[in-house]
């Protein structure tokens, strides 16, 4: 790399569209995007983002990325399609099918699991996922074209993403574009943005929610120590101290 900019990876397929990127540590990065050649596009770097390598589509039950279903893609709503804990990485799809992919080897090989959230439409499915630890995670999304609909728009897992159960179905906020666990809360405290009403938080793992702000944002991240929630969207960058959120 010379100067301050350089091309470190380029996809030759003109339909390529990357939706999210995540850093597992100082050296390993994983990015994902819409399907190319029959599976979600996944690329990895093991040296801090210099050269990248594309993970191939799996052949039958072999290593790689499992085949995508008709209309399955991903939403670039909040860089929320990827999450990790240790060496385990999860990846979320939406649209024609909304599934959770899991890699136990830092993104090199993947298995995929179904979710019960609404899917099948162009703007339905999961928009964001997060994991509190290697077993407990949450998916949030819904129908972008019917944002008030709070049915089958969120699900949780307690077995590392293999099975999912609908969460607070028909109660609480509707569509959301970014959901995050607060660090240090043992998976009990969450924040949600992208809803029609603004910012909501939960104290019980997502079963019930409190509305804390009418301001609209698209993405959210907690500071590493959980002392503040950072949000962005609509030309704004905001910070909510934990005390303002009731914690």
Regions found by a protein language model. Name each.
Residues 1-247:
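Residue-level hotspots at or immediately adjacent to binding/recognition sites across diverse folds
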């Amino acid at each position: 790399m010379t100067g301050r900019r350089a091309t470190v990876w380029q996809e030759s397929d003109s339909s390529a569209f990357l939706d999210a990127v995540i850093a597992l540590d100082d050296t390993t990065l994983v990015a994902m995007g819409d399907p190319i050649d029959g599976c979600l596009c996944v690329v990895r770097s093991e040296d801090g983002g210099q050269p990248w390598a594309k993970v191939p589509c799996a052949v039958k039950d072999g290593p790689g990325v499992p085949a995508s279903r008709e209309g399955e893609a991903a939403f670039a709503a909040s860089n929320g399609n990827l999450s990790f804990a240790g060496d385990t990485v999860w990846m979320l799809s939406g649209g024609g099918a909304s599934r959770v992919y899991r890699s136990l080897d830092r993104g090199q090989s993947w298995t995929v699991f179904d979710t019960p959230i609404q899917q099948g439409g162009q703007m339905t499915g999961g928009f964001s996922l997060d994991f509190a630890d290697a077993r407990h995670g949450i998916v949030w999304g819904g129908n972008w074209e019917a944002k008030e609909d709070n049915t089958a728009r969120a699900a949780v897992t307690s077995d590392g993403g293999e099975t999912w159960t609908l969460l607070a179905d028909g109660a609480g906020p509707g569509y959301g574009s970014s959901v995050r666990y607060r660090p240090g809360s043992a998976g009990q405290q969450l924040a949600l943005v992208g809803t029609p009403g603004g910012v909501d938080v939960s104290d019980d793992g997502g079963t019930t929610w409190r509305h804390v702000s009418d301001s609209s944002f698209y993405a959210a991240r907690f500071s590493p120590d959980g002392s503040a929630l950072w949000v962005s969207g609509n030309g704004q960058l905001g910070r909510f101290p934990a005390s303002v959120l009731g914690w």
